[in-house]
Amino acid sequence: MRKLRQNSLMTSATTPALGVIGVPKEIKGDERRVALTPDGAAELVQMGCQVLIEHDAGRGSGFSDEMYVSSGAQIVATAKEAWSAELVLKVKEPQAGEFDFLRPDLTLFTYLHLAAYPKVATALKHSGCTAFAYETVTDRNGVLPLLAPM
């Protein structure tokens, strides 16, 4: 994650300029990854964000709830609470059980693969949310860094 200048992001001592970020547990079969590590959560908290992590969202990737709490994130009990954030970070495209969480004031960052999942495209369109597909993010050279092998 690129470091942003903190003083340009804060609007006041009590109001985070970047708002609330939610990380729900992935529900797609066999998906164990999580969209945000505890270190990433700590960086966002330091920039003034409130970070909501659904209980056990990081467990499949080896991150405990306690690790997120130590980073300054808050653990929430339900997906609904994580999805209530202004910005939601996920790994996989929204599943049918998550479509009701999509709404006009939501920004979603995740892999979308819309050509393979037309029902997701339809749900996103009808919800009015703003969605960014990781697989389409390019750098200055036109390279797709989020598709590079880890």
Task: Describe each region flagged by the PLM.
Residues 2-20, 26, 96-150:
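Glycine/serine-rich phosphate-binding loop and adjoining beta1-alpha1 elements at the start
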Residues 22, 41, 45-60:
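Short internal beta-strands
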Residues 29-38:
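Glycine- and acidic-residue-enriched helix-capping/strand-helix junction motifs
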Residues 49, 73, 129:
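Short phosphate-binding/catalytic loops that engage adenosine nucleotides
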Residues 52-74:
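N-terminal beta-loop-helix "entrance" segment that forms/cooperates
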Residues 72-84:
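Short acidic low-complexity segments
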Residues 90-91, 111:
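Short, well-ordered coil/turn residues at beta-beta hairpins
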